[in-house]
Regions:
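Mixed-charge, Lys/Arg-enriched low-complexity segments
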Residues: 1-20, 60-83
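Acidic, low-complexity, intrinsically disordered interaction modules
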Residues: 18-71
């Protein structure tokens, strides 16, 4: 499922559908791959990956995107980083 990341005109619709307005301002658009839009949180530097057509959430692991639920995706983005 993983492919090249295409960077072009930002697509904010999946993010706007997933988060409240005050929260999506903290994300940067990084591109799209295989129909999954990639956003990076400005502070945690973690990604929130959302299907452009489905609104489903994904996490990148072992060279591929695996589907996870919304709660897991949000938790991943905001959990403290371990150093």
């Amino acid at each position: 499922m993983s492919g090249a990341i295409e960077v072009g005109e930002p697509d904010w619709k999946p993010l706007e559908g997933a988060l409240s307005r005050e929260n999506y301002a903290d994300f940067m658009y990084m591109g799209v791959t295989s129909g999954i839009v990639l956003y990076k949180h400005r502070d945690t530097r973690r990604y929130l990956n959302i299907g452009s057509e489905t609104g489903r959430f994904y996490r990148y692991a072992d060279g591929d995107y695996i589907e996870i639920n919304r709660e897991q995706a949000i938790e991943h983005v905001y959990e403290p980083r371990q150093i």
